């Protein structure tokens, strides 16, 4: 019997505030709503989905390292503000060598200059930004397609 595909969704700092934080930029959908929808989609495709959110860089790194040990097949990550600052996140993602998609609710290229650079994009399998919460659904669909190839 083959193991079910496993996808991990990682959420960075302040994403726990979705729905109440700058809804004009990030929308009104909560993180719980996003995770619930992704869970439903994953279940329908017979894929194991786990989610993790932290406001702390080291905890995100620890969880990504654990993903390798757990046999996770794909990571979907919204690194939040760490997108623009964290060489450590880049290093752990490169180190575990699990394919990943970088997701952003807002279009980081239409925002402040400092938000236009990502330390992760050039090593990501794909990048989705500016599509709001549906970006996560598209990332999940792409991950499942890639895993099941």
Swiss-Prot record:
Keyword Amino-acid biosynthesis recorded: yes
GO molecular function, one term: 3-dehydroquinate dehydratase activity
Record's keyword terms, sorted: Amino-acid biosynthesis, Aromatic amino acid biosynthesis, Lyase
UniProt catalytic activity: 3-dehydroquinate = 3-dehydroshikimate + H2O
Database matches in InterPro entries: DHquinase_II, DHquinase_II_CS, DHquinase_II_sf
Family matches, as PROSITE patterns: DEHYDROQUINASE_II (PS01029)
Catalytic residues as annotated in Swiss-Prot or TrEMBL: 26 (proton acceptor), 104 (proton donor)
Assembly and binders: Homododecamer.
Sequence similarity: Belongs to the type-II 3-dehydroquinase family.
Family annotation (PANTHER family): CATABOLIC 3-DEHYDROQUINASE
Protein name listed in UniProt: 3-dehydroquinate dehydratase
Species annotation: Polynucleobacter necessarius subsp. necessarius (strain STIR1)
Gene name, Swiss-Prot/TrEMBL: aroQ
């Amino acid at each position: 019997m083959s193991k079910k595909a496993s996808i991990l969704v990682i959420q960075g700092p302040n994403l726990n505030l979705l729905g109440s934080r700058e809804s004009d930029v990030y929308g009104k959908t909560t993180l719980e709503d996003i995770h619930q929808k992704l869970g439903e989609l994953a279940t329908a495709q017979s894929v194991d989905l786990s989610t993790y959110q932290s406001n702390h860089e080291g905890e995100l790194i620890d969880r990504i390292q654990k993903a390798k040990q757990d046999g996770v097949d794909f990571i979907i990550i919204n690194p939040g503000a760490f997108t623009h600052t964290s060489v450590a996140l880049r290093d752990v993602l490169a180190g575990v060598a699990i394919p990943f998609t970088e997701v952003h609710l807002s279009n980081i290229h239409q925002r402040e200059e400092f938000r236009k650079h990502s330390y992760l994009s050039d090593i990501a399998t794909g990048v989705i930004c500016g599509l709001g919460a549906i970006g996560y659904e598209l990332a999940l669909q792409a991950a499942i397609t890639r895993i099941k190839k």
